[in-house]
C-alpha cells in the first residue's frame, strides 16, 4: 500500500493545463514589492517577466536558479509586426509565423521564437490588417500580469 500512496501523491501533483504557451527556463531574478513581485525567467536567449503575488512566490518556493515554466493563455498573447515601441507590455519576442488557422471570427496564429512555439488567438480582422502570413516576421507580445508561473 505504501507504494500506492506514493503513486497517488505523485498523480495529484501532475497537472495538465490548457494554456498553449509554455516557456520552460530558469529564474534569473525575483524583485519583490509590497504585494506582488516580478519574476524573470530565462528561456533560450529570451527572458519573460511575470508579475505574481508574494504569496505565490513563497508558496512555489521561487528563488533565483529554480527551474520553472512560465505560462500564458493564447487569448492573452498579442501579435505585432515591424518595430514594436511605445507599449507597456514587458514581454516582446520576435519570431516567425509558422501557421495560421483562420476561423470565421478569430484566427489562431502560431509564431516560432527560437525553440518555443507561441499561439495567439486574435481576431480574423486583426490578422488580415497585420497581413500575417506563414514565413513573415512577427512579434509575440505578453503583459507581465498575464504570465503565470508553474514550479
Please place each PLM-identified region on the residue numbering.
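Intrinsic disorder/low-complexity detector
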Residues: 7, 31-33, 112
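Glycine/charge-rich catalytic "coupling/switch" loops of P-loop NTPases
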Residues: 1-24, 29, 47-49, 54-99, ...
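Short strand-coil-strand connectors
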Residues: 42-44, 112-114
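Short aromatic-glycine-enriched beta-strand elements
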Residues: 34-40, 104-110
Amino acid at each position: 500500500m505504501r507504494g500506492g500512496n506514493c503513486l497517488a501523491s505523485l498523480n495529484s501533483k501532475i497537472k495538465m493545463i490548457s494554456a498553449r504557451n509554455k516557456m520552460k527556463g530558469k529564474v534569473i531574478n525575483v524583485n519583490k514589492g509590497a504585494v506582488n513581485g516580478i519574476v524573470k525567467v530565462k528561456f533560450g536567449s529570451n527572458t519573460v517577466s511575470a508579475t505574481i503575488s508574494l504569496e505565490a512566490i513563497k508558496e512555489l518556493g521561487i528563488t533565483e536558479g529554480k527551474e520553472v515554466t512560465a505560462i500564458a493563455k493564447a487569448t492573452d498573447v498579442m501579435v505585432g509586426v515591424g518595430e514594436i515601441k511605445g507599449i507597456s507590455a514587458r514581454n516582446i519576442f520576435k519570431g516567425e509565423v509558422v501557421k495560421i488557422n483562420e476561423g470565421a471570427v478569430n484566427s489562431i496564429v502560431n509564431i516560432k521564437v527560437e525553440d518555443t512555439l507561441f499561439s495567439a488567438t486574435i481576431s480574423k480582422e486583426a490578422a488580415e490588417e497585420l497581413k500575417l502570413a506563414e514565413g513573415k516576421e512577427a512579434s509575440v507580445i505578453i503583459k507581465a500580469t498575464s504570465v503565470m508561473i508553474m514550479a
